[in-house]
Amino acid sequence: MTKPNADSLMKIGQLKKPYGIKGWLWVFSETEEREAIFSYSPWWMKTATGFKPLTVTQWRRQGTGIVAQFEQVPDRNVAETMNGVSIWIDKDSLPSTEEDEYYWSDLVGLSVINKQDECLGTVKELFETGAHPIMKVVPSQDSIDDEPRMIPWHKQTVDVVDLAAGRMVVDWERDF
């Protein structure tokens, strides 16, 4: 298997604690539908020495989560060392997005500018809350202050996303 280009990879999940004695692991999926993570391949795991292949041999729902067994994890002893390992795929294996639709990984790193043309910071991450996703915006060199912000990812809040320019415009006052 050819080594991946790290710049073309996107994180889609993470391995969690072992399940059972045969090397199975809990899998935390960052895909919109939890089981959709298994429709993408090949998987890559990020290690201290670079990206290595991670091959799913079987998976299943277990309670409210999902567990999987991997070719590279023969037993529980190895599984114990895998907790926290991130799962990556090549972005080229993803379907194209529609207009005004974005992969969260494409939004991370964008500058966030409000309607008053003030830089509020940079998108560090997005996370789901139930009602709607939230962008964690952290101060940047160009931001108006040193305040981190939690800004809803919502059509009433986000006016413009310009991936090419590396910025988004939001309807968000500096003192919200």
Swiss-Prot record:
Where does this polypeptide localize?
Cytoplasm
HAMAP family in the record? Ribosome_mat_RimM
Read off the InterPro entries from this record.
PRC_barrel-like_sf, PRC_RimM, RimM, RimM_N, RimM_N_sf, Transl_B-barrel_sf
Against Gene3D superfamilies, the record matches this protein to:
PRC-barrel domain, RimM
Annotated PRC barrel domain ranges read 99-176
Q: Does the keyword Chaperone apply?
A: yes
Task: Output the Gene Ontology terms for molecular function.
Answer: ribosome binding
Quote the protein name from its UniProt record. Answer: Ribosome maturation factor RimM
Described function: An accessory protein needed during the final step in the assembly of 30S ribosomal subunit, possibly for assembly of the head region. Essential for efficient processing of 16S rRNA. May be needed both before and after RbfA during the maturation of 16S rRNA. It has affinity for free ribosomal 30S subunits but not for 70S ribosomes.
* Domain-level remarks: The PRC barrel domain binds ribosomal protein uS19.
Q: Per the similarity annotation, which family is this?
A: Belongs to the RimM family.
Oligomeric form and interacting partners: Binds ribosomal protein uS19.
Among NCBIfam families, the record links this protein to: 16S_RimM (TIGR02273)
